[in-house]
C-alpha cells in the first residue's frame, strides 16, 4: 500500500497526457481566488514563505506537474480553538460535535457523542465551524491523520487538537488525501514537529511543506487508479485471511 501511494504522488502510477491543462493553471486560479478573498476581508494575507530551492525538491517531476508549498495550495488553514475556550463543563451529550484527531478514521469523521457542546457554545465558536469540502487534520499525536468533511458534518466544529483546511472549489481533495497518506510526507511533518511527550504540528510547518501537484485531470486518474488498487489489496488480504483460517 505504501508503494502504491509513493508511486501515485511521484507521477509513476498512471501515464501523463500532454493534452492535460498544466498544474500551473490551477495554481493561478487559486492565487486569484485568494486575492479576491483577501480583498473582501474574508481571509488574512499569509506571511510570505521562501521560494522553493532546488535542494528542497526530493524527486524530479513529470511534465505538467509543479512543486508548490501548502501555503500556495490552501485557501486557508485554521487552527482549532485554544483549550481555554472550551471547558469540561461545556460538554454535553448529543450536541454539536467537536472533531479531534481520534475522530479521524480512514479519511472519515467518526464523532464521539460525548464530545459535543451546546448550540449556544457552538455559536460562540462559529469561527471554527467546518464546511462541506473542508479537510480536518491532526496537529497533535499521529501527524498526517486527516478526514474529509461531508454534508453530514457541515457545521460541526474543529477541535483543539486539529486544523482545518479550506480548498479552492476545483481542487481534488482526494488527491490531497493521498499526499497526506504518503509515508514520505508524514515523515517530513513528523521530523519538523515539536514535542517530547506528544508531537505537535504548527501552522508554519504545514504551510511550508511541499506538494507535488499534477494537472487536475491527472489527479482524477491517479485517485481512480489508487482506489482500484487498494480494493485489490483488500481482496487479496481477505483471501489470505480466509485461507489461513481454513
What are the residue ranges of the model-derived segments?
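Conserved hydrophobic residue
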Residues: 13-14, 43
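Sequence-specific dsDNA recognition surfaces
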Residues: 51-56, 71-88, 102-132, 151-152
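Short, well-ordered beta-strand elements within core beta-sheets of diverse protein domains
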Residues: 58-60, 163-168, 207-213
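Specificity-determining recognition surfaces
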Residues: 97, 182-211
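Extracellular/lumenal ectodomain signal focusing on beta-strand-rich modules
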Residues: 72, 145, 208-210
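A short beta-sheet element
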Residues: 100-101, 119-181, 194-195, 200-202
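Non-catalytic DNA-recognition/assembly elements of restriction-modification systems
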Residues: 1-3, 7, 12-13, 53-81, ...
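Terminal amphipathic helices with adjacent charged low-complexity linkers/tails
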Residues: 21-25
Amino acid at each position: 500500500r505504501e508503494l502504491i501511494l509513493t508511486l501515485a504522488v511521484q507521477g509513476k502510477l498512471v501515464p501523463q497526457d500532454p493534452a492535460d491543462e498544466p498544474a500551473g493553471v490551477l495554481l493561478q486560479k487559486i492565487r486569484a481566488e485568494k486575492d479576491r478573498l483577501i480583498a473582501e476581508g474574508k481571509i488574512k494575507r499569509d506571511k510570505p514563505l521562501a521560494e522553493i530551492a532546488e535542494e528542497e525538491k526530493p524527486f524530479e517531476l513529470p511534465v505538467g506537474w509543479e512543486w508548490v508549498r501548502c501555503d500556495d495550495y490552501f485557501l486557508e488553514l485554521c487552527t482549532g480553538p485554544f483549550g481555554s475556550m472550551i471547558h469540561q463543563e461545556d460538554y454535553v451529550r448529543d450536541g454539536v460535535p467537536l472533531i479531534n484527531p481520534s475522530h479521524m478514521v480512514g479519511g472519515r469523521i467518526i464523532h464521539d457523542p460525548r464530545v459535543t457542546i451546546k448550540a449556544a457554545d457552538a455559536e460562540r465558536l462559529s469561527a471554527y465551524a467546518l464546511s462541506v469540502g473542508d479537510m480536518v487534520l491532526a496537529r497533535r499525536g499521529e501527524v498526517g491523520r486527516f478526514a474529509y468533511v461531508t454534508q453530514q458534518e457541515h457545521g460541526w466544529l474543529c477541535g483543539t487538537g486539529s486544523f482545518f483546511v479550506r480548498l479552492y472549489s476545483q481542487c481534488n481533495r482526494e488527491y490531497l488525501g493521498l499526499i497526506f497518506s504518503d509515508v514520505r510526507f508524514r515523515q517530513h511533518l513528523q521530523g519538523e514537529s515539536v514535542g517530547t511527550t506528544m508531537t505537535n504540528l504548527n501552522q508554519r510547518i504545514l504551510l511550508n511543506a511541499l506538494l507535488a501537484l499534477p494537472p487536475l485531470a491527472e489527479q482524477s486518474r491517479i485517485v481512480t487508479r489508487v482506489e482500484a488498487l487498494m480494493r485489490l489489496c483488500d481482496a487479496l488480504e481477505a483471501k489470505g485471511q480466509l485461507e489461513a483460517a481454513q
